[in-house]
Amino acid sequence: MDPRGILKAFPKRKKIHADASSKVLAKIPRKEEGEEAEEWLSSLRAHVVRTGIGRARAELFEKQIVQHGGQLCPVQGPGVTHIVVDEGMDYERALRLLRLPRLPPGAQLVKSAWLSLCLQERRLVDVAGFSIFIPSKYLDQSQPSKAEQDASLPPGTHEALLQTALPPPPSPTRPVSPPQKTKEAPNTQAQPISDDEASDGEETQVSAADLEALISGHYPASLEGDCDPSPAPVVLDKWVCAQPSSQKATNHNLHITEKLEVLAKAYSVQGDKWRALGYAKAINALKSFHKPVTSYQEACSIPGIGKRMAEKIIEILESGHLRKLDHISESVPVLELFSNIWGAGTKTAQMWYQQGFRSLEDIRSQASLTTQQAIGLKHYNDFLERMPREEATEIEQTVQKAAQAFNSGLLCVACGSYRRGKATCGDVDVLITHPDGRSHRGIFSRLLDSLRQQGFLTDDLVSQEENGQQQKYLGVCRLPGPGWRHRRLDIIVVPYSEFACALLYFTGSAHFNRSMRALAKTKGMSLSEHALSTAVVRNTHGCKMGPGRVLPTPTEKDVFRLLGLPYREPAERDW
């Protein structure tokens, strides 16, 4: 992940969490001068738990509650009606954070999405679908019945609560890693790293804006600006895609980041993506800092590092160790072992762990595997070992020779880390097209049959994946002769009109690509592996309402030029 982009991505300023809930807050009409505020929350006596929600967003919630007639109460204050918590909170953690043995009488534990919907609808909506179930033993003995609660509500509130319940708005997601090739099993949580769930403080409060910054290398504009159809001027020096990867900063804090990366990995394999992202943010901020960190105050001054994380940094500086590493669950190395099986992600690894499996032999002999997972397990060690560049060259030439046996004009290019000039590669992606725009048709199946007959392709993971006019094969290959390992190979056949954008996409790096796509979006454009389009209309949520107009891009240089970027050679895109 890009250290330089992260530093640019997190300016030292207060920021609003740009998820569905915070967008709702941004859309609340501002009160005009002289206009009396509507008090449609007059029956609400709320307490907002900031953990997970974040200070800035919680303050916005509290301001809106008061502005619209509601009251803010201490959690044990008389008459508190709603305790608002983060979406991912369960009742056990909520009570632990509140330091209460049971819920106060008359109070309901609700997700923050409920309050967001109330603000969006400008009314008190039903909590159905938003309330968090609490076993009766955690309810105060004096907790009134539902009928008693209804009877105590002010006039008009009962009717408001009886209105049809709306489903909670979907939580926005932005992938940190590529999607799994196979369907994941239901999520079952493994043992957490430690019982001290509140110990991470600020670094766990990662906003969707932070996520956007991580993947684009640019801190998003304010939420109010998201609705402006006119693209804002772009400062290119803040974008990863505008800079050569050779400008990556020297890591002056390696002794710190190494230990934090262990924790980040532990959270990641346990499926705690937001906490893992919080650590990634801090790690990259440290990597890009211009000097070794020497004090707590200096650590706090770095954008992307909060007080809790600064405490961990100082602990490492003073003792050379981080005590939290001593409490990493024994499940972590097992989960990492399992998640390295091709076709098995975090959720599947957690499911296997919960079923009692502890080794690859357990998986091999007892687990129910998909076809892809069985292949991934069979070639586990081969897939994990990166291949030397010379082997990737041999694989590219084998595919090229087989393809050009059908048509000598076919272009075959190995992409990915190979094209970026890396000394080793994890897999090989070969892109195939023909300059006449026609002769690539029909080559896909014939090429695969030929490579199978040669014994070059040994296993099929995904025989054919249609993506518009592009066809993609995911499989396993092995070069002829003794001593060669099984390697992951993807073959993608594309029309020539899409070749430049596909070449850019499959060359990567993934971080560089995400930065380019985010930049295109700010310009009212859209970039994908198929095309670069302009005049793209999006709604207020950023979703495309139409395809726009496709721009001609004969070469990669045209894509850079149309985006107003200096051209970067593949070796300069290795962010």
Curated annotation (Swiss-Prot):
Positions of region (Involved in primer binding): 420-429
Tree of life domain: Eukaryota
SUPFAM superfamilies per record: BRCT domain, DNA polymerase beta, N-terminal domain-like, Nucleotidyltransferase, PsbU/PolX domain-like
Entry's localization field: Nucleus
Biological processes per GO annotation: base-excision repair, gap-filling; DNA biosynthetic process; DNA replication; double-strand break repair via homologous recombination; double-strand break repair via nonhomologous end joining
Molecular function GO labels: 5'-deoxyribose-5-phosphate lyase activity; DNA binding; DNA-directed DNA polymerase activity; metal ion binding
Residue positions binding Mn(2+): 427, 429, 490
PANTHER family referenced in this protein's UniProt entry, alphabetically: DNA POLYMERASE LAMBDA, DNA POLYMERASE TYPE-X FAMILY MEMBER
Role summary: DNA polymerase that functions in several pathways of DNA repair. Involved in base excision repair (BER) responsible for repair of lesions that give rise to abasic (AP) sites in DNA. Also contributes to DNA double-strand break repair by non-homologous end joining and homologous recombination. Has both template-dependent and template-independent (terminal transferase) DNA polymerase activities. Also has a 5'-deoxyribose-5-phosphate lyase (dRP lyase) activity.
Subunit structure: Interacts with PCNA. Interacts with PAXX; promoting POLL recruitment to double-strand breaks (DSBs) and stimulation of the end-filling activity of POLL. Interacts with XRCC4; promoting POLL recruitment to double-strand breaks (DSBs) and stimulation of the end-filling activity of POLL. Interacts with NHEJ1/XLF; promoting POLL recruitment to double-strand breaks (DSBs) and stimulation of the end-filling activity of POLL.
Name of the protein in question: DNA polymerase lambda
Gene encoding the protein: POLL
